[in-house]
């Protein structure tokens, strides 16, 4: 029980994005990523509008529950922000206990429909230890209208590179499945050094360099993403609390998973050289944004409710029966 309370100075510094060619974030989690992220829809749209970013992708873990509110707020005349509707899914092949993160973005209304199908199928048929997983064959079946990204360190590509130590030609085969590849700030993967998977920060840079080489060899785009879970740098203490509550022993070592401005992101990838950094931070994410329509996750005209044979008569009979029991 709290015996006293006092207002604390949150210390939040209002950041601005003054870059004349702003970036697009393609990997971001809202509070709908259960017990994992802290960004609210209102906070996100307000920030994206203020920073002048052309669009933002929302990719919550295994769910699309943020979509209705995202559509409502982003399409308001006072905001008019483009949202790229997506999800971070759990991809698996034949091993029941092994799945990989994958970013799935809806390119158009067909993609929205197929994304919904994947959400339904993964929750109804392939839940394993709380994770709604998507078989690769099912994803391929419903791939129309979707853009697939290789995701984070928990994705198939980085896991195969860092933990399985697969040779380069095998990595090329894996990378060829995806429409674009993803690299992230070094802080996101700092635990790989802490746990001995790579020797030092230079090893983390080499992971990103290898992904870039793969994209060059395969003719694919590589994009730099934040994998944002909270809005500002100082917010990571709150995610530490969430992770501690979930039992993570390394919760105190929180990576800086905050949403970065364009210049902040360019600084993160300065080791690639100015031209290459601009390519992955600004040019390529904007190219992917240009491929994507302004989608409506909730239809404007009507909703398509399920048709269950005999349901109207059954409901009527149930109501009359209950009424007779009560009265």
Annotate each predicted stretch with a short phrase.
Residues 82-93, 98-101, 211-217, 230-235, ...:
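Phosphate/diphosphate-binding loops
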Residues 3-22, 26, 275-327:
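Non-catalytic structural connector segments
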Residues 94-95, 105-132, 250-267:
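Metal-dependent DNA phosphodiester-chemistry modules and their immediately adjacent helices/loops
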Residues 89-94, 112, 156-157, 188-190:
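A short acidic, often aromatic-flanked loop/helix-cap motif at beta-alpha or helix-coil junctions
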Residues 84, 90, 103-106, 149-150, ...:
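Residues in well-ordered beta-strands of folded domains
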Residues 27, 60, 83, 108, ...:
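A residue-level signal for conserved active-site and pocket-lining positions in enzyme catalytic cores
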Residues 9-58, 62-78, 117, 121-235, ...:
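Domain-core and long-helix interface of multi-subunit machines
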Residues 34, 105, 197-204, 252-259, ...:
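Hydrophobic alpha-helical scaffolding
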